[in-house]
Swiss-Prot record:
Keyword terms: Chemotaxis, Hydrolase
Gene symbol of the encoding locus: cheD
Disulfide bridge map: none
GO biological process: chemotaxis
Task of the protein: Probably deamidates glutamine residues to glutamate on methyl-accepting chemotaxis receptors (MCPs), playing an important role in chemotaxis.
Protein name: Probable chemoreceptor glutamine deamidase CheD
Reactions the enzyme catalyzes: L-glutaminyl-[protein] + H2O = L-glutamyl-[protein] + NH4(+)
Coiled-coil stretches noted in the UniProt entry, renumbered to this chain: none
Lineage: Archaea, Methanobacteriati, Methanobacteriota, Thermococci, Thermococcales
Length: 161
């Protein structure tokens, strides 16, 4: 069974299934996995920090508050925060004519994701971020492996992390 995660959303599962998200541009997709209990989760965050944007609306649309929700729901399925491993995708620079640091949302999303993972003691074990193209990712909850598909310079690139 495949669960599709939209922008500003997340999903968790235990032992089986695929959790996917499509069209990661400047957004980031963060997968977390507890190998021992085979609990996985995926967050598709739109913006870096809730406080910076007034904290309005859905907390899952922000990296910092969305990650917190994801971890809490994974713990309900038996995951241990000490055993979580993270993989990070997305954070592309989608607008080539933008050079203002404040408008480089993709770069900021990646920076905040790394900071928040480190703050929580979660090891980042794989990453495919930046660039100019969108990505689609599929987390296999039975193994923790993430299949990524992206288009770069007109070529489709697939990789497993």
């Amino acid at each position: 069974m495949e669960v599709k995660v939209g922008i500003g959303d997340y999903a968790v599962a235990k032992k089986t299934g695929i959790i996917s998200t499509y069209g990661l541009g400047s957004c980031v997709g963060i997968t977390l996995y507890d190998r021992l209990n085979r609990v996985g989760g995926l967050l598709h965050a739109l913006l870096p920090e809730s406080a910076r944007y007034g904290g309005r609306g859905n907390p899952a649309k922000y990296v910092d508050t969305g990650l917190e929700l994801l971890i809490k729901d994974m713990m309900k399925l038996g995951a241990s925060p000490r055993r979580l491993e993270a993989k990070l995708f997305g954070g592309a620079h989608m607008f080539t004519n933008v050079s203002n640091e404040n408008l480089m949302v993709g770069k900021k999303n990646v920076e905040v994701a790394k900071r928040e993972l480190k703050k929580r003691g979660i090891r980042l074990v794989a990453e495919d971020t930046g660039g100019k193209g969108g990505r689609t990712i599929y987390l296999d909850v039975s193994t923790g492996k993430v299949r990524m598909r992206k288009v770069s310079n007109g070529k489709v690139i697939e990789a497993v992390f």
